[in-house]
Amino acid sequence: MSLPSPPVLKTTIIQLNKELDPEDDNNNYEILTNDYNNYGSSNTSDAGSIPTSPIIEVSGTTKSGSGLPNKKKRRRSTANIDSEELAKRKNETKQLHSIIEKRRRIKINREFEALKYLIPACRNCNTGSSGGSATPTSSTKKASTNSNNNGNKIDGMYKLTILKSSVEYILYLHHIIQKQHQLLSSISAKDTNGGILAEKLKAFEDFDIDFAKVPLNVNQYRNIDKDFNFKDLMQDLDGRSVNTESPETIIEENEPVSETSSTNNTTTLHYSNSSVLPSRTSSIVSSRQSSSLPTPELTPILSILNKYSTSNNQLNNRKNSNPISPQTVCIKSQNPSPFTMPMKSSLSTSIVNSPSSSSSLSGSKSYMAGNNAVNTVKFSLPDPVVNPNSTLNDNIPRKGLISGIPEEEEEEKINKGSANTETVNSGSASSDENNDNDRGVLLKLTDQDVSKTLLALRKSSIDSLLN
């Protein structure tokens, strides 16, 4: 007895025709050699071993009606084609591409469904609600789709999960093959009369291979023009059903409530490990556990409530200032503000009552926070650098804002201003009167010079000044 080698890829045959897939029931959709299978015919193996040349199908016949194809026509240029014909061809091409893409997605989903059916871990975790994979058929023009198979999930399971499970399952099969090969090779003629052979044969008999007894014909589900439901195959399995539970149950351990009570911990772990119990039993257990625990309403921790209390007066003030609860702890405010209404100011009484700070706290104002008065410092502006009551010396001429005034006129103004300052310093009454007259003349001349200068400037110069 010889074991077959692993299957290999067949030679791909490209068929160029207008039909997407020929409607033939005898088509072989397998891409690997199936010499190991019983239903594989000799024709299939021959076709897989001998590569064939691509077949090109050309539609159309001759004018005489014979089956011989016409000669290949030359490609016509699109210059003589109307715009309507071009739009029609583009629309047909777009529809053809959409149909091809849709059929490709259906084929991919079928393969994922086959993987989910073959892998025991995915087959047992059947989370789908109903229906199976009712893929669209040609009779309904492929208009109906199944809600269970969306872009990322196949019957409630993610495609990535199915791929990961398939890889791990293949690794498991490789491991089983290696172990069986080691057991078979270790059996020798010396063990025929002893008990070692019986133990090894018993190990083979005890190994359950029901997970591998899953019949599947790829030619059935890969024909997307026909409906195929993998749940029907699952129901046909002997001793299995659609809602088969997983052999490995998930163990959920609750955190122990009390470290000292070891009995409660053991009961909690015992009931959490047995996930097969009914929900009523689990509810009874949870009610018993909750009744044995102390409730915070009956045993409050009173020491925490009086942690920040120093005297009875402070407790009474806190109760009056905070109407939420008489047991509310009021922490000293670090950032007092009249807008936030602090409960207690961060300024101590020693600083307020000190004589050094009496001058700075003279303008203090009290703000009420509930029934407590809080003393805060009144905000005041700093002393001005320049005394507004002092008279400025108006005799000194200021620099003109307009840069268009000639420099000679500015020098004359400065000289006149210096002469006026000298007359003021002399202190005579006659010089004061002359100074006032000169000042009026200076203002008039300045206004005239400014107006003349503005009129003399061009528009571009004005724009540059404004900018």
Curated annotation (Swiss-Prot):
Gene Ontology CC entries for this record: nucleus
Subcellular location, record wording: Nucleus
Record InterPro entries: bHLH_dom, HLH_DNA-bd_sf, USF
Molecular function per GO: protein dimerization activity
Domain bHLH: 92-173
Signals that turn on the gene: Expression is induced in biofilm and repressed by alpha pheromone.
GO biological process entries: cell adhesion; positive regulation of cell adhesion involved in single-species biofilm formation; positive regulation of cell-substrate adhesion; regulation of transcription by RNA polymerase II; single-species biofilm formation on inanimate substrate
The UniProt record lists the keyword Transcription regulation: yes
Coiled coil: none
A family per Pfam: HLH
Highest rank taxon of the organism: Eukaryota
Keywords, sorted A to Z: Cell adhesion, Nucleus, Transcription, Transcription regulation
Phenotypic consequence of gene deletion: Decreases cell adherence to silicone substrate.
Principal subcellular localisation of the protein: nucleus
Compositionally skewed regions (Polar residues) per UniProt: 43-52, 323-338, 417-432
Record region (Disordered): 43-83, 128-149, 245-275, 312-365, 390-439
Record's compositionally biased regions (Low complexity): 257-275, 312-322, 345-365
Protein's job: Transcription factor required for yeast cell adherence to silicone substrate.
Record's protein name: Transcriptional regulator of yeast form adherence 6
Organism of derivation: Candida albicans (strain SC5314 / ATCC MYA-2876)
